[in-house]
Amino acid sequence: MEQNFARMIDHTLLKAEATKEQIEKLCAEAKQFNFASVCVNPTWVKHSSELLQGSDVLVCTVIGFPLGANTPAVKAFEVKDAIANGANEVDMVINIGALKDKNYDLVQADIAAVVQAAKGSALVKVIIESCLLTDEEKVKACELAVAAGADYVKTSTGFSTGGATAADIALMRKTVGPELGVKASGGVRSLEDMKSMVEAGATRIGASSGVAIMNGLIADSNY
């Protein structure tokens, strides 16, 4: 079971002040525990890719992060640049304001631009920033992600007012059905936290506390 859990974790370090030494430690830990991926900012993709060469650990990065307020063209360029640097997965933030405005065509086109840019090269996870949305908006965001051809929906950036909840994961899973992945991120700090997310329907976990989770310890990290 522990190995299965390890393969569900995106070992994450997205803090602005992350140093080269910290990224190298992240990658070493990911290799040690055989995590699914490391999730790093775009500036660290190339170095992480080099460090993880020959391992099963993928490189995941973030697009339009953390606000989601870039244009679709900029997000698409970010994806292509990330792939050129070695990214295997991209976690993009939706246009949250457009969703609130019920400008669903723009929200879907924005996701579709990223999906198109990643096609054949990288898996796409769509961050809906659930803490800022009503349940109705969460459902709509997930439906738009499905329509745009995304691979996953994801709760949170970890940089807003809240993180993943089991209730949100259950709602997202119910909305997207069994085919799409669902990623819980933000505030998953212990093995118990992770178990509750997986039981609710999560298939991937984004956490900076991956090592603590694997050791069954509660970390004092905020992400």
Swiss-Prot record:
Assigned keywords, A-Z: Cytoplasm, Lyase, Schiff base
Record keyword Lyase present: yes
Broad class of the protein's primary localization: cytoplasm
Pfam families: DeoC
Compartments (UniProt record): Cytoplasm
Keyword Cytoplasm: yes
GO molecular function, a single term: deoxyribose-phosphate aldolase activity
Enzyme Commission code(s) on record: 4.1.2.4
Domain of life: Bacteria
Annotated pathway: Carbohydrate degradation; 2-deoxy-D-ribose 1-phosphate degradation; D-glyceraldehyde 3-phosphate and acetaldehyde from 2-deoxy-alpha-D-ribose 1-phosphate: step 2/2
InterPro entries registered for this protein in UniProt: Aldolase_TIM, DeoC, DeoC/FbaB/LacD_aldolase, DeoC_typeI
GO CC annotations on file: cytoplasm
GO biological process, one term: carbohydrate catabolic process
Function: Catalyzes a reversible aldol reaction between acetaldehyde and D-glyceraldehyde 3-phosphate to generate 2-deoxy-D-ribose 5-phosphate.
Family to which this protein belongs: Belongs to the DeoC/FbaB aldolase family. DeoC type 1 subfamily.
The protein, known as: Deoxyribose-phosphate aldolase
Organism for this UniProt entry: Lysinibacillus sphaericus (strain C3-41)
